[in-house]
C-alpha cells in the first residue's frame, strides 16, 4: 500500500511553502515571477487532481453530439479522440452544420468545456460569477 502523497498533493505543499515561507523573503523585483510560479504550480496540481475524468466527460459529451464516432477505434488515446472531435466541432461550427436542432446541445457542450477549463485555470472566477 502506498500512503505517500501524490503529485497533486506534493505540488500543493510546495506552493504553500513558496507562498507562506519563501515569497515574503524574495526581493520585490522577483515577487511577480515567484507568484507566477506559485500559480503555475496550483494549476498543475488541479490538472493532476482532475486526471482523465474531465477528458472522459468531454468525450462522453462529444459522442452524445456525434454518436460513437471513434470511441471504438484502437490505438487512439482519450486525449487524441477528444482533440480530433474538437477539431471536427470547430469545423462544423464554422460551417454552420450544427445550427438549428443541434445548436442547444452545442451551447451546452461549449459551456461545459469552458467551465471545466476554468475549474483548472481560474476556479475563483467561476465562484465570483456564480457558476460554481
Which sequence ranges carry the predicted segments?
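Secondary-structure capping and boundary motifs in well-ordered enzyme cores
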Residues: 6, 10, 33-36, 81
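C-terminal amphipathic alpha-helical interaction region
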Residues: 10, 14, 21, 59-132
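Charge-dense, low-complexity intrinsically disordered segments
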Residues: 1, 5, 31, 76
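An acidic intrinsically disordered interaction segment
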Residues: 1-16
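Short, charged early-sequence alpha-helical segments and their helix-coil boundaries
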Residues: 47-64
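N-terminal interaction modules that seed assembly of large macromolecular complexes
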Residues: 16-52
Amino acid at each position: 500500500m502506498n500512503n505517500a502523497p501524490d503529485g497533486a498533493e506534493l505540488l500543493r505543499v510546495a506552493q504553500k511553502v513558496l507562498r507562506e515561507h519563501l515569497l515574503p523573503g524574495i526581493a520585490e523585483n522577483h515577487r511577480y515571477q515567484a507568484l507566477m510560479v506559485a500559480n503555475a504550480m496550483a494549476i498543475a496540481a488541479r490538472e493532476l487532481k482532475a486526471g482523465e475524468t474531465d477528458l472522459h466527460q468531454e468525450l462522453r459529451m462529444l459522442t452524445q453530439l456525434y454518436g460513437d464516432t471513434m470511441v471504438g477505434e484502437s490505438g487512439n488515446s482519450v486525449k487524441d479522440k477528444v482533440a480530433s472531435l474538437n477539431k471536427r466541432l470547430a469545423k462544423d461550427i464554422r460551417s454552420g452544420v450544427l445550427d438549428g436542432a443541434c445548436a442547444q446541445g452545442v451551447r451546452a457542450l461549449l459551456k461545459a468545456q469552458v467551465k471545466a477549463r476554468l475549474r483548472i485555470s481560474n476556479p475563483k472566477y467561476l465562484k465570483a460569477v456564480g457558476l460554481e
